[in-house]
């Protein structure tokens, strides 16, 4: 089930003026309708034509190209934007759209995993679906779910957890404990049937569900792994079709939150847990005693197994709050939030590498400053004064070395006669 990434000239009985008038009228109608749709949680029905409308796809294109607008496939699509968006719309409405082939890339930071990316046209389709249904599902989620949500994020999750750790640390008694839940190979083990059943409780639009089913149950590409296996351990022919989501898909982030919202609701409303924080598949629960958290752990383990067909791995643990813990890539205690040692070492190594490339002329100033800013962003919400001082020294030495080399080049040009008047 693959599709060429070449875009064809759309066939239409309308001339250019009629198309423009139709698009403008459709834009006005859709903006009003979508504002009504997102005004409150509801059953999602009769949504497909709005999702596939020109203004919806145009907004999806604007979202999909952020940070990627100068890539060849994006430039090619943008060059004939209106024609291509109309073509996408027609394919979605007549049911002829099929997912294109995934591009695969192995990444090793922070750990080795397989990232998959769809062709640009399919990313637009996913954005169109996401921007319509995600706000509706988001209203069903608990306050303390922090991944891939507006006004949330990993740093807010870290600060909320630290706030609660400080609260319980002041309570009388022998000291509280935390339960850190680690779901085994979460993205590779999501059960398609369970996910579609959860989506189907809220979505009654048949064409929308058919499209989501095509994204989840891709027959062209398996996303799942056998229990206990890592991506690099499983040969291509042994990947599973009935479980798993592609890391890199926008919809996978949304599906992950929707899937684990079932656990959130169970913990908050059935087990009545107050101190509960989740960032994607990283979950921390605070409890008065180790015995209390052991009971919670068994209840959660049973729910995950029976309802979501997931398992916890050996990293799941119960320890005293006073010992601190690692969460969202940070080391959190009641007093400080620090980077993990592995993160600190990675930043040092990467920073030195880009500084060396810049001083040697292998990296231009714009790219250099952009990558430096990216690394600074990793440190902004943690106590990293010593690390910043060390990196600042490396940075200044790189700048000085670059200026020295540029000055030497000017001197060489001047004395060789290339920079002065000829005799």
Predicted feature residues:
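Hydrophobic alpha-helical membrane-insertion signals
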Residues: 38-83
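Right-hand nucleic-acid polymerase module
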Residues: 1-35, 118, 127, 232-242, ...
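Active-site-proximal segment of RNA-dependent polymerases
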Residues: 47, 133-188
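Short, conserved non-catalytic motifs in the polymerase core
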Residues: 67-75, 100-126, 140-153, 219-257
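Short Gly/Ser/Thr- and Asp/Glu-enriched loop/turn motifs at secondary-structure junctions
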Residues: 100-102, 277-281, 313-315
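Amphipathic alpha-helical blocks
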Residues: 78-98
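Conserved polymerase palm-domain catalytic core
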Residues: 84, 91, 164, 168-280, ...
């Amino acid at each position: 089930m693959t599709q060429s990434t070449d875009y064809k000239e759309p066939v239409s009985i309308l001339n250019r003026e009629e198309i423009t008038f139709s698009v403008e009228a459709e834009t006005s109608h859709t903006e009003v309708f979508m504002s009504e749709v997102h005004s409150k949680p509801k059953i999602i029905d009769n949504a497909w034509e709005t999702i596939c409308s020109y203004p919806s796809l145009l907004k999806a294109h604007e979202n999909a190209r952020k940070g990627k607008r100068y890539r060849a496939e994006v430039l090619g699509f943008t060059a004939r934007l209106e024609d291509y968006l109309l073509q996408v719309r027609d394919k979605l409405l007549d049911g002829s759209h099929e997912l294109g082939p995934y591009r695969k890339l192995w990444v090793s930071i922070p750990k080795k995993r397989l990232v998959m990316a769809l062709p640009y046209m399919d990313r637009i389709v996913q954005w169109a679906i996401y921007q319509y249904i995600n706000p509706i599902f988001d209203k069903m989620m608990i306050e303390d779910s922090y991944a891939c949500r507006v006004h949330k994020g990993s740093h807010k999750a870290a600060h909320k957890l630290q706030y609660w750790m400080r609260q319980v640390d002041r309570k009388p008694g022998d000291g509280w404990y935390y339960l850190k839940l680690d779901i085994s190979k979460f993205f590779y083990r999501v059960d398609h049937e369970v996910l579609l059943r959860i989506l189907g409780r809220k979505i009654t639009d048949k064409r929308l569900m058919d499209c989501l089913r095509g994204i989840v149950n891709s027959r062209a590409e398996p996303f799942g792994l056998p229990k206990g296996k890592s991506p690099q351990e499983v040969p291509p022919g042994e990947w599973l079709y009935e479980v798993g989501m592609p890391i890199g898909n926008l919809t996978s982030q949304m599906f992950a939150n929707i899937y684990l919202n079932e656990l959130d609701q169970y913990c908050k409303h059935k087990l009545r847990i107050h101190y509960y924080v989740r960032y994607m598949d990283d979950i921390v629960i605070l409890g008065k005693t180790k015995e209390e958290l052991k009971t919670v752990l068994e209840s959660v383990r049973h729910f995950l197994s029976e309802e979501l067909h997931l398992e916890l791995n050996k990293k799941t643990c119960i320890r005293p709050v006073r010992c601190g813990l690692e969460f969202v890539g940070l080391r959190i205690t009641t007093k400080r939030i620090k980077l993990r040692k592995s993160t600190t070492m990675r930043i040092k190594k990467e920073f030195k590498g880009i500084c060396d490339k810049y001083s040697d002329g292998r990296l231009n100033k714009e790219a250099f400053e952009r990558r430096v800013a990216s690394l600074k962003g990793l440190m902004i919400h943690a106590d990293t004064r010593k690390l910043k001082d060390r990196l600042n020294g490396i940075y200044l030495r790189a700048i000085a070395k670059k200026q020295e080399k540029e000055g030497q080049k000017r001197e060489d040009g001047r004395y060789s006669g290339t920079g002065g008047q000829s005799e």
